[in-house]
């Protein structure tokens, strides 16, 4: 399995150090494996739903990236972007460390060549 599909201990520590009373919005940039990667990831999406519900997570957006409108003009490396909001960093960590979730995660890891996950917060400057 690619190292980019699993967080480092330092990345987990950085997420856990975020404010506990603020939601965290995860930006998933996903590149599927050529052989049945999309199907494996779709199975993950179906099976992860109860785990998301248990911790209060919500999928806010899922979309494909067919073209760049502004920028270098090349097609992005990722196939799909999925945005998921969690009520807190602890909620996300609770989900991904759950024994039952770990079984479901196999479909995610098995379906991806690359899967970058960026933790973001609401930008108060935009309000």
Locate the predicted segments by residue:
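Short S/T/G/P-rich N-terminal loop/turn motif that feeds into the first structured element of a domain
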Residues: 1-80, 87-94, 121-127
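Short, Lys/Arg-rich amphipathic alpha-helical interaction segments
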Residues: 83, 90-127
